[in-house]
């Protein structure tokens, strides 16, 4: 597939750039949303900018993973890059919020192909004994990109304009495109096969319904509104139809027989659970720094750097030792560090020093990092190459689904706890200060408005925010404990050289 070691390194560089763009894109845009809304207006539509991207990414992952198994990795990776670049350029020139949302949907179609196919190409071009190190490298880039996004977004918005949050993808993508087109030569032969159109259609409708329900629920519409209930009902119905369709399809989008394999099934559960807990760290640690410590947006972004470094270390360790011991043993190290770090984060108060927060972040990042390199490898362990794309895209899909559900569920809980704490703190006081700040906590993030709040009032608000955030860190221990139990069932398998591959049963 690759003619020399030099070319191999260039292909890996091209894949890393693709992962860098797709993993960083949503978090880097989130930081710039305030500026974008101020420029384009239509505040009531800004949620669609994120929703449109996530919907098409999630819908595209399993479909492109399967298509890459059927017709080859290179053509669909290049397709994903081109669509992502076109979408990024269009986003940069958007003049209305509606235009930006449509262009983000286009961008998401490309993003849905980049991540799963990049990991699968690595499994194709490297022998088993080297895959661990390479997936560790790719996993480290994924973790770093996700955490680096908010910080980079803040700097780009401040020093240039929000347009460059999207334009920055263009030169990166062009370099990635050049490296893959020139140096990656796919040798596998792919016969023409029947595409599972019915499965693709029902999956897209199911995913779109679920994603819009999660993205719009509690924001555009209340959770018990007809719109949200209708979306959840649509998801349930089309997902059931999808399952029945896949059981009869010649080439199903998701091969459910793989879930009969213990290592594959447990890896998917862990991807979902780790995704659900990882996202709350990336979202709520910066909020804690800004609202509780009174830091700036840049300071909040920088505070994630220790977690980023910890995740890089964890991903590297997990990758290197895949051939030395079982996936289960390595994941036990992961979940132990992850649990300890999250537990320590749940004990924070407004008096907790930033040094201690930094140490907590390194520990939780180290535990989290293992999952970035181990779970994709475990998902394709001993699988026939023609199923790798589908297996890896399923893992990416479930991690992303976990992230979406996690930020929705934990975000709702945090908001409710914050309001309850404020009402309790200001109970019996005149003026309704608690209700005022429950409705507009943004005043805590702006130094000018924050300085105008009376000190005794500010102390109560800060304590309420601190309690609400540490409360969800404590609740996050539940899925982490479930992860620990799941790890027990992974078995003793590890990366072995010249191991017989498993075909469909």
Segments the model singles out, each with a brief description of its role:
Residues 144, 148, 357-435:
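Small-residue-rich alpha-helical segments with characteristic i,i+4
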Residues 171-188, 204-216, 234-248, 483-491:
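C-terminal membrane-cytosol helix-exit motif in multi-pass small-molecule transporters
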Residues 8-61, 99, 161, 198-200, ...:
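Transmembrane core module of solute transporters
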Residues 400-489, 497, 503-505:
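Hydrophobic transmembrane architecture of multi-pass small-molecule transporters
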Residues 19, 81, 85-88, 103-104, ...:
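A generic transmembrane-helix signature of 12-TM secondary carrier transporters
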Residues 36-37, 67-68, 152-160, 214, ...:
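Interfacial helix-cap and linker-helix signal at transmembrane-aqueous boundaries
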Residues 45, 130-137, 299, 387-394:
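Cytoplasmic loop-to-transmembrane helix junctions
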Residues 61-198, 216:
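Helix-loop-helix hairpins in multi-pass membrane proteins, especially solute transporters
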């Amino acid at each position: 597939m690759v003619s020399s070691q030099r070319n191999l390194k260039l292909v890996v560089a091209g894949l890393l750039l693709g992962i860098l763009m797709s993993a960083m894109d949503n978090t880097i845009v989130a930081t710039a949303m305030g500026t974008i809304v101020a420029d384009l207006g239509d505040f009531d539509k800004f949620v669609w900018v994120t929703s449109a991207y996530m919907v098409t990414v999630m819908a595209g992952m399993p479909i492109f993973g399967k298509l890459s198994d059927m017709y080859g990795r290179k053509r669909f990776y290049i397709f994903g890059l081109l669509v992502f670049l076109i979408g990024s350029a269009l986003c940069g020139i958007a003049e209305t919020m509606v235009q930006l949302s449509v262009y983000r949907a286009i961008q998401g179609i490309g993003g849905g192909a980049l991540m799963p196919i990049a990991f699968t190409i690595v499994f194709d071009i490297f022998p088993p004994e080297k895959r661990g190190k390479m997936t560790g490298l790719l996993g480290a880039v994924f973790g770093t990109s996700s955490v680096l996004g908010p910080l980079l977004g803040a700097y780009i918005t401040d020093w240039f304009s929000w347009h460059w949050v999207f334009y920055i993808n263009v030169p990166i993508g062009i370099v990635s495109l050049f490296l893959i087109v020139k140096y990656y030569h796919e040798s596998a032969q792919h016969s023409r096969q029947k595409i599972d159109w019915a499965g693709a259609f029902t999956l897209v409708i199911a995913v779109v319904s679920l994603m819009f329900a999660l993205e719009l629920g509690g924001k555009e519409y209340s959770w018990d509104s007809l719109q949200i209930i209708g979306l959840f009902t649509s998801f349930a119905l089309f997902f059931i139809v999808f399952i029945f369709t896949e059981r009869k399809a010649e080439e199903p989008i998701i091969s459910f027989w793989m879930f009969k394999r213990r290592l594959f099934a447990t890896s998917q559960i862990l991807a979902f659970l780790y995704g659900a807990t990882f996202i709350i760290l990336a979202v709520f640690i910066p909020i804690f720094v800004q609202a509780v410590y009174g830091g700036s947006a840049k300071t909040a972004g920088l505070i994630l750097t220790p977690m980023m470094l910890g995740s890089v270390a964890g991903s590297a360790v997990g990758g290197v030792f895949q051939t030395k011991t079982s996936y289960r043993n390595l994941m036990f190290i992961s979940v132990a560090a992850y649990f300890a770090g999250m537990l320590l984060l749940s004990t924070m108060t407004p008096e907790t020093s930033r040094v201690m927060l930094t140490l907590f972040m390194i520990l939780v990042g180290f535990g989290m990092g293992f999952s970035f390199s181990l779970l994709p490898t475990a998902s394709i362990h001993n699988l026939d190459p023609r199923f790798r794309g589908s297996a890896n895209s399923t893992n990416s899909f479930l991690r992303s689904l976990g992230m979406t559900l996690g930020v929705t569920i934990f975000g709702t809980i945090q908001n409710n706890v914050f309001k309850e704490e404020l009402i309790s703190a200001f109970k019996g006081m005149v003026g309704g200060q608690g209700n005022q700040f429950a409705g507009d906590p943004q005043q805590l993030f702006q130094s000018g408005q924050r300085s105008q709040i009376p000190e005794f009032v500010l102390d109560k608000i800060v304590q309420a925010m601190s309690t609400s955030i540490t409360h969800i860190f404590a609740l996050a221990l539940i899925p982490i404990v479930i992860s620990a139990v799941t790890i027990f069932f992974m078995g003793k398998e590890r990366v072995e050289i010249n191991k017989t591959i498993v075909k469909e049963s």
